């Protein structure tokens, strides 16, 4: 029963952490009045493209987040849980190599400690990101509306 609940909690937690990173993109889109509907595809790339020329500081921060190993591990685990076979269980799947070779073998599951570390690290990264974004938005409004 404990493994079941841990797996369930891990799935939900990783899904929500990733979703919160994505929600901030919608906040940024609204902040700059980009007119992108929340259901449109490629919203992240469209927002980042806009920021590249219009807000270099936020652009750099988002690029740094996307290349962060903690973010990448969290995203990878979340995608596996959502779209593939669970990394929380031992499994046997084909592995496709660039050379065209296909190999088979048993892939070990991630340990509870590994999953817990990914969740904790991801939450810390999300907190840092939200703190940065909050200060950035505050500065945005000060510059936009507090013209003395």
Over which residues does each language-model region extend?
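Short, positively charged
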Residues: 20
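Acidic, Ser/Thr/Gly/Pro-rich intrinsically disordered interaction regions
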Residues: 3-8, 15, 23-148
